[in-house]
Structures are given as C-alpha cells and as structure tokens.
Amino acid sequence: MNLFFNHTTRSADRWLTGIVLLLSFFGVLMVYDASVAIAIRDFGNQYYYAREQLKWLGIGILAMIMLSRIDYHMWHRFVLPAILGVMVLLVAVFIPGFGVRALGANRWLNFGVFILQPAEAAKLVLILYLAAWLSVKEKKRLGAFLLLTGSIFSLVMLEPDLGTAVIIAGTALVMYFLSGAPMKHFAFLLPLIIAGVVILAVSSPYRFRRLTTYVNPDSDPLGASYQIRQVLISLGSGGLTGIGIGKSRQKYEYLPEANTDSIFAIIGEETGFVGTTFITGAFAFFVWRAFWIAARANDTFGKLLASGVASWVGIQSILNMGAMSALVPLTGIPLPFISYGGSSLVILLAASGIVLNISRQQKL
C-alpha cells in the first residue's frame, strides 16, 4: 500500500484547494436557495436537495484528500482497465432496469444505494488515459486518438448528451495539441469539427429547435424559447448587485432546472453582475492555477493530466455560463462544483485531488 502514496513533505497547493472549497460550499448554499420550492413540492422538505448535495460534498472532499496523497503516477497502470470499464458503463445505461431514463435521455445507472452518471466518470477516465498514452506515444497517433475519442463521444451522444460529448471532445483536443501534435493535424481536424457540429445541430429536431431559439429567443416564447427567456429575465432582474441571497422569484418554478443547469441564472438574479463576475473570476482562477501546476509538473504525464482537468473545468464552465448568458445555445450541462448533482461533484473533487497531488511533487 505504501507504494501508492508519495512521502513528500510538501503541502498541496493551497490556492487551488481554497478555490475548490469556496466554489463547492457556495454551491451547497445556492442549491438550497434555488431548490426550496421544488424540494417542498416533490419531497415536502425544503432542505432535501441541499442535504443531498452536502452529503456528496463530504464524500467528494474525502476523495479529494485521499487522492491528493496518492502518487499520481500510480494511475498510469490502471488507465486501460479504467477506460474499458467506463465504456461498458456507457453502454449499460441502455439496459432496462439498470439504466435510468429521464427527460428523454438514458444517462444514469441505478446501483440501488446511489445513481451514477457514467458520462461524468468518462471525462476523468479519458483524461487519465490520454495523459498516460500521449506522454509515451510519439508517432502515428492521430488515427488511434480519433478512434478512442470518437468512441467515447459516440457513446455519450447516443444517450443523448451533446453538451457532455462536446466537453469530452474539446478536452481531448486540448490535451492532444498540448502533447506536441503538429499544426497540420489541427488544420485537418478543424473543418471536420465544424462540419460535425453543424450535422449534429441540424440532424436532431430537438437540437435544431435549441439552435433556432438561440438565434431568435422570441421564436417560441412558451415552448422551446421558454427556458432561455426565463434565464435572461433572471439575469436582468439582478442588475448590478442583485436582489439579495434567498430573494429569487424565478426559483418558484418559473425557471426550469433552477438548481442544476440554470443555477448560474439564480446566482445572477440574487447577486447581480458583481456576483456573476466573482464566480466567473473564480473559475478563471481555478483554470489558471491548474495550468500553473501543470507547467511545473515533474513529467509529461503530470503536465497533461493537470492540463486536462484545467481544460475540462474551463470548457464546461464557459459552456454553462455562455448558455445562461445567451452567448451559446443551451447545452444542458451543469456548472462545475456548484450545480446540484452527486456524480459531477464527487468526480470533480476527485480530479482536483489528483491535481493537488501533482502540485505536491512539482518542481521548486
């Protein structure tokens, strides 16, 4: 067991630890605030969602502490069974009685005592696998990279979950080019990516409606445009400093997904431009600090691993906040560390723990 733990006396990066805990505990507060109405409606207990989020936060913090002390090099030997295992789980969501279907998608697995969203685990596992593989593979890797990333992307798209698929693909591409891939590969991939996004957008009636509501939010105010209109009402109501914590009107079932995908809009309503700027800055700081740790890692594996986590959190937060600001189409993805959801929170905290272990072993 001692082989798994590094014995450096250097402490983990305090700045990254602080920003992760700040975002996570603020998330519990906002989950409680945003979910009061639906918690009473569905469970007769206004604290239900906050209590669940706090439970998962406790588990996540324990995972973060443990993984911050486990030598990150140990993960190198487990990446192959991990990637195969997560692909099996992504297929298992379609098994009747085991997979859970909700809101028109098969995204969850029911293990009895808890429900897991395999696509969240796939983000971290793919980062681990790519960091290990790209740190040793030097030539003829584009085809294999596209096959692996494309397989994970396709399995997530079958659920369907375009938002998570885009995060996975974007994170993988950043890691690929940070590993030293030639720019001619970028020139080859860019038109394929653009064409793929266009095809995915127009091939599904649901996604096409979301795209048209992005272009024209007034096109269907009581239907496809309803959520984005309520989001903009929330943000507009907040003004400069907000109407006050706990005073949101939109959380009373006017705004869909108020405690999950749309929680940034509740933050904007209650804390205004000042609050949303602070949260945006907090995510920017996390991304910068994780890349800072990556730049000082002792080896390529550590550099790519920390860079992958930084890219994941950066892409996901940009997509969520961009969608809530009507800068990009709605994608249905949670705000990292803040939105309600056990799988997302625990896995993000676990990933942060791995980055913290890299910081414990970084160059002075």
Language-model-detected regions and their locations in the chain:
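A juxtamembrane structural motif centered on a specific transmembrane helix
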Residues: 1-4, 320-364
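N-terminal membrane topogenic signal
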Residues: 1-20
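Hydrophobic alpha-helical transmembrane segments of multi-pass inner membrane proteins, especially
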Residues: 17-25, 29-33, 40-227, 265-326, ...
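Short linear Ser/Thr-Pro motifs
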Residues: 24, 33-36, 248, 339, ...
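Glycine/serine-rich anion-binding loops at beta->alpha junctions
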Residues: 112-122, 158-160, 239-244, 333-347
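Ser/Thr-centric signal marking residues that sit
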Residues: 164, 260, 331
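TM-adjacent membrane-interface loops and short helices in multi-pass inner/ER membrane proteins
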Residues: 213, 217-260, 264, 271-275
